[in-house]
Amino acid sequence: MDADSDWRSAPFRQKLVSQIDEAMRKAGVAHTKSSKDMESHVFLKAKTREEYLSLVARLIIHFRDILNKKSQAAATDPMNALQNLTGTAVVGGQGMGMGVRPQGAQMGAMSGMAQMAQQMNLPGQPQPGASGMAPHGITGVAAGNQATQLQLQQIAQHQQQQFQQQQQQAALQHQQQQFQVAQQQQFQVVAVAAAQQQQQQQQQQQQQQQQVQQQQQQLQAAAQQQHILKLQLQQQQNQQQQLQQQQQQQLQRIAHLQQMQQMQQQQQQQQQQQQQQQQQPPPQQVMQLQQMQQQQVAQSQQQQLLSTQPQAPSLVAQGQIPSQVMPVTLTPQQQQQLKILQQVRAQQQQQAQHQAQQQAQQQAHQQAQQQAQQQAQQQAAQQQAQQAAQQAQQQAQQAAQQQAAQAHLAAGQVTQNSIPVMSSPSPVQQVQTPQPMPPPPQPSPQPSQPMSQPNSNVSSGPAPSPSSFMPSPSPQPSQSPASARTPQNFSVPSPGPLNTPGNPNSVMSPASNNQSEEQQYLDKLKQLSKYIEPLRRMINKIDKNEERKKDLSKMKSLLDILTDPNKRCPLKTLQKCEIALEKLKNDMAVPTPPPPTVPSTKQQYLCQPLLDAVLANIRSPVFNHSLYRTFMPAMTAIHGQPIASQLVVPRKRKFEEDERQSIPNVLQGEVAKLHSKFLVNLDPSHCSNNGTVYLICKLDDKNLPSVPPLQLSVPADYPDQSPLWMDNPRDYEANPFLQSVYRYMTSKLLQLPDKHSLTALLNTWAQSIRQACLSAA
């Protein structure tokens, strides 16, 4: 069993109960509780071994104190005790045995008892120290009573034993107290050490918690930084994507512009080449004709050899044979046909050279007529070039649609059509055909001049009508000029009427209409480009308005039509868009384009850009507001506040006395137009004999503090002269706030122009008070 819990055991408690019982018995105290009850009460009250032992020790000491008090009371009267002992020896002995004295009292009693014994043993002989005892009546005691002597000796021995026991108990108690004090000190030291350790542990725990919190804060800061970095990266990626999209859009626009420029350059080059060809002599025309024929022959051969599907028939130059699309695979018969075509084209080239020589001989006689027809031929050549280009596109689409119908007709058939170039009929043209042919075009004095176009197989020869390219349902065998020289006959569709440049009765083909519509579309789109920016502003303005969602969708579709080149709409739709934009013109505030300026040879005026800007925006509904907002501050700084004058000229008075009024009309009108916070009255302390008006102005503004009124003098020739402030420094020396108002007022008056109005002066006064309030705050 542990030392801390052995005090709870029954033997240990029984031992202490016996000690308490012995102490009670020695003290001779009659108590209602027994020693066991007292011990159980102490046991229940104590919580530790030390507390239990200390309570039991106090109980035993209490009984011993009672015993000591009784022994002291018995020792104060020894003669009475001896008399009691002579009567009842046994009872006296018991009574003496119950008393406990201090050490000095016990020794005195013992010496007295010894002296008494000596006197008893030797009667009649006085002993030293016994003379003081005679008055107490010891002489009356029998000297020969031996029983009494024995009793006294027993009592003395018993007292000595008790004294020794008391000394031993006192020593034990002293040792126990020292032991308890030492234990308490040890417990205190241990408790202090434990408390210090606990404090250290708590401090360490707090430090660890602080470190953990710091680490958590660092982790949170790192996480926030990572989140911020992620957001920055996302923003950078979004910006890069936007930049890439913008760059792609710009590249697309640049590519579109480059294509348009290339097309324009090609058209210009074609026109220049046409003009050069018209101005060149006939030998140069022959050389160009030969080169074009050779190039087109080579191109037609490559197309026929490499084509995998039927293609649209192309227009050829004068003297060439337009051929239909060859089938996908070339048979030996088709190869022979190609050779025959090459031979025919070579013969036609020779004929063209012969005809060119004849034309050169006749050119001297035809110069007068040539000059008259030259302009008409140039226009016709340009129109035919445009028609040929558009017809080629249309025919390509038609050929793609009719691919299935022409598949069984394309095999073994080669369409040929000879176009006369010479003015006089050649032997080839004089060959008769079984089928009646349309009359050949009338020979013109000036031969039709070919028009070469780069990178195209379109020539300026006569443009056959669309019917010439469509195979007839039941083609009749006809003998072409080439068939007169070849053993084979080819079935060809009946040619339609030919329109040559020299034929004044030639009909315009649908291609010219398409070209004109294209030009009109581009012009209209360019005309409507002025609505793009106002339309965007209008869309941004009503984007958040849910009530105008329909208008918003319409506006967005209009903007897409005007800005997106990929969205192509008919010309009629574009005209409807123009009508809708005209209706929205007032809402969008579209600036009207300035009138076309006539280029002048003189030096440009210095303010011409400003005048142009004014002319461009003069019809805008916000023009006057913009002018007022732009120029009004500068004009106010130069001339001061505007003064509202009476426009109605006052009638002249009959008498001079009536002409001089007390208050001028200008001043009355200005005072009437003042803000309601300014209360203006005439100063009764001054008399205006010379026309000067003295006023007292008060400020009634709930947002500003109350200040002394302002005294003003308005001269008679106001507004030619400015009003004056009759400053009185005494009114503004009451407190620092009024002093600051006075300083600000004097400084602001110096900033006013030389000519200023009463309104400007009062506004300056209110501004000074407001500025003083701000500085005081």
UniProtKB/Swiss-Prot annotation:
**UniProt KW keywords:** Activator, Cytoplasm, Nucleus, Transcription, Transcription regulation
Keyword Coiled coil appears in the UniProt entry: no
> GO terms for CC?
core mediator complex; cytoplasm; nucleoplasm
What's the short name of a Pfam family annotated to this entry? Med15_M
GO BP terms: namely: regulation of DNA-templated transcription
Ranges of biased composition (kind: Low complexity) = 420-434, 449-471
Cite the record's Polar residues compositional bias ranges: 500-519
Per the record, which residues fall in region Disordered?
120-139, 418-520
From the Swiss-Prot or TrEMBL record, state where the protein is found. Answer: Cytoplasm; Nucleus
Q: Compositional bias (Pro residues) spans?
A: 435-448
Q: List, in alphabetical order, the Gene Ontology terms for molecular function in this entry.
A: transcription coregulator activity
Q: Member of which family?
A: Belongs to the Mediator complex subunit 15 family.
Q: How does it assemble?
A: Component of the Mediator complex. Interacts with srebf1 and srebf2. Interacts with smad2, smad3 and smad4.
Q: What does this protein do?
A: Component of the Mediator complex, a coactivator involved in the regulated transcription of nearly all RNA polymerase II-dependent genes. Mediator functions as a bridge to convey information from gene-specific regulatory proteins to the basal RNA polymerase II transcription machinery. Mediator is recruited to promoters by direct interactions with regulatory proteins and serves as a scaffold for the assembly of a functional preinitiation complex with RNA polymerase II and the general transcription factors. Required for cholesterol-dependent gene regulation.
**Listed PANTHER family:** MEDIATOR OF RNA POLYMERASE II TRANSCRIPTION SUBUNIT 15 (PTHR31804:SF3)
The identity of this protein, by name, is Mediator of RNA polymerase II transcription subunit 15
Q: What is the lineage of its organism?
A: Eukaryota, Metazoa, Chordata, Craniata, Vertebrata
